[in-house]
């Protein structure tokens, strides 16, 4: 999962930088950074938004789809814009935008979301998620959602 997340995050980073964004990554290689370490990087960067990229897992072998999570209500517009952009691709089953007190969204003072880009525990979805085309589709949709969010607040 960590490698898939990094691949997708790097695609998002590249696309956002191509649009002129200043992007700070909490990790750029196959290294582990504690939750507190991620928080330190984020606070020092003082970002406009925070997006945490993940893949989901479940005990059910049939669980599938995309969902994202927020903590503070001011993060809902970001969550919904990204959710809608991913949904527009038709690439994954769409679950929902949900409130949940994940550490990274709870301690971040800017609009922040944690994305769950499919279930690696479901064989059919895993086979899709490991492809470059899937990572490209999800990264592009995430970027489009971020752009829509910023356009909506100007």
What are these regions (language model features)?
Residues 2-154:
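Active-site-proximal helix/loop segments of hydrolytic enzymes
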